[in-house]
Design a protein with these regions (language model features):
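Active-site entrance/lid segments in N-terminal catalytic domains of soluble metabolic enzymes
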Residues: 2-219, 355
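Conserved active-site-proximal phosphate/metal-binding subdomains
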Residues: 194-199, 203-225, 230-376
Length: 376
C-alpha cells in the first residue's frame, strides 16, 4: 500500500472532528437494502456507517439500533425520510390500484405469484420514528425529503446528535442551514435510488454532483458532503478539490456482500462498463435511479399509471418477490448510481482499504490547494 500523505492530513475535516471518526467517508443509507452488518463494518473501519430506516416501524428501528450497537462502539447514522408519502396516498382507491396492477399482473402470474388485493394505506409517522432515534441518542441522524420540525432539531442539538440533511439544489442547502442542520449532503442526480428533493419537483432538481458541490460550498458555511456518482478514489479527491469535507458512497457498498442487495443485484452492479442506469417513478412512485432493465423500460412507457409513493413501492414488491425467486433480474428494481460501473469490490472492508490507500497517496496536495483558496 502507498504511505499516507502527511501534509496536510486529508482525512481531518470538520465532519471527522464533529463525529470523532477517522475518515470523512459516509456509507450511503441504502433503504430496504441496509444491514446492521454493513453499517457496523464501515463504522468499525473509521468511516460513518448508515442505516436507512424510513420503511421501518418505530419498534423495529429500536431493535435495529440495539443490534448495531452490539456490532460496533463507533459512531453510526440512522436515516429517515421527512416526507413519508406523496399527495394522494391516503385517497388513492381500489380502481387506481387495479389500473396500476394491470401493468404488472402478467409478469406476476407468469412467475407463479399471487395477485395482491387492494388494502387502504396505513402510514408510518416520521415523528414517531424520529422519537426512537432521539430516545436512543444515536450519534448521527441523516434525512432526506425535507427538514424535520424545529423541536426535533432542537432536541438533536441538545443531545449532541449530529444532523445531516440532503440537498439537491443550493437553495435547499441554504434552508437546511437556516434551520440549524449541522452537515449538508449535496446529492447530485448521478446518485442511485432516491435523492430527496423538497423545494421543487425532482425532475426540476437534476444538477450533477460536481456542479452542485461547489455551489453548495459557496452558499453555506456548514460542512458539505458530496454524494452521487462517487465510487472510487478519483471521485473522492475531485469532491475534496471542490470544497467537500466528506463523501457519501452508495452503489460501491451496495455491491458488497455485507449489503442487503440480492445476489442478482450485486452481480448486475459488478457487470462493468455495460451497465446503464435510468430515472423512473415506476419502482416506488418517486423519481429514483436504477439499472436500466425491462421493468424500468416498461414502467417508463407513456400511459402507465403510477401510484403515489409509497403505494407504488408496495405494488412493485408483489412482482419483485417472485422475480427474485425465479432469478429474473430484468423484472427487479435494481438501484444503482451512474458510477456503478466502477464497482469492483465485494467486501466492504477491502473497498474501504483500497479507497483510503489510493486517496491518501494523492489527496494532500489537492486539499492544501483548496484550503489556500484554489479555484476561487
Amino acid at each position: 500500500m502507498n504511505e499516507p500523505s502527511t501534509s496536510p492530513e486529508w482525512n481531518k475535516t470538520r465532519i471527522t472532528a464533529s463525529l470523532g471518526i477517522e475518515y470523512p467517508i459516509i456509507q450511503g443509507p441504502l433503504g430496504g437494502l441496509s444491514t446492521q452488518r454493513l453499517t457496523a463494518t464501515v463504522s468499525n473501519f473509521g468511516g460513518l456507517g448508515s442505516f436507512g430506516a424510513h420503511g421501518w416501524t418505530p419498534a423495529a428501528i429500536k431493535d435495529v439500533i440495539a443490534e448495531i450497537r452490539t456490532l460496533t462502539a463507533k459512531p453510526f447514522a440512522m436515516n429517515l425520510w421527512v416526507s413519508m408519502e406523496d399527495e394522494g396516498a391516503h385517497t388513492s382507491g381500489s380502481e387506481a390500484f387495479a389500473r396500476s396492477l394491470s401493468f404488472l399482473s402478467g409478469h406476476i402470474q407468469a412467475l407463479g405469484g399471487a395477485l395482491p388485493a387492494f388494502t387502504p394505506y396505513v402510514p408510518i409517522k416520521f415523528e414517531d420514528q424520529a422519537r426512537v432515534l432521539l430516545d436512543a441518542k444515536v450519534p448521527a441522524f441523516s434525512f432526506i425529503y425535507g427538514i424535520p420540525p424545529k423541536e426535533i432539531l432542537d432536541e438533536c442539538r441538545a443531545q449532541g446528535i449530529l444532523t445531516i440533511g440532503a440537498a439537491t439544489t443550493a437553495d435547499e442547502a441554504i434552508v437546511l442551514e437556516q434551520a440549524g442542520v449541522d452537515v449538508i449532503a449535496a446529492s447530485g442526480f448521478e446518485a442511485g435510488g432516491h435523492r430527496g428533493s423538497f423545494l421543487r419537483p425532482a425532475e426540476e432538481s437534476l444538477t450533477g454532483t460536481f456542479s452542485l458541490v461547489p455551489q453548495v460550498v459557496d452558499a453555506v458555511s456548514a460542512p458539505v458532503v458530496a454524494a452521487g456518482g462517487i465510487a472510487d478514489a478519483r471521485g473522492m479527491v475531485a469532491a475534496f478539490a471542490l470544497g467537500a469535507e466528506g463523501v457519501q458512497i452508495g452503489s460501491a457498498f451496495l455491491a458488497c456482500e455485507e449489503s442487503g442487495a440480492s445476489l442478482h443485484h450485486r452481480k448486475a452492479l459488478l457487470s462493468g462498463n455495460t451497465l446503464r442506469t435510468g430515472l423512473t417513478r415506476g419502482f416506488t412512485g418517486r423519481l429514483a435511479r436504477g439499472i436500466h432493465n425491462q421493468l424500468l423500460e416498461e414502467l417508463n412507457r407513456q400511459g402507465v399509471e403510477i401510484l403515489p409513493y409509497p403505494l407504488q413501492r408496495g405494488l412493485v414488491r408483489n412482482l419483485a418477490i417472485p422475480a427474485e425467486k425465479a432469478a429474473k433480474p430484468e423484472l427487479l428494481p435494481l438501484w444503482a448510481g451512474q458510477s456503478a460501473s466502477l464497482c469492483r469490490h465485494t467486501d466492504a472492508k477491502e473497498l474501504l482499504q483500497t479507497l483510503m490507500s489510493e486517496v491518501s497517496s494523492i489527496a494532500g496536495p489537492v486539499l492544501q490547494w483548496n484550503r489556500e483558496g484554489g479555484g476561487k
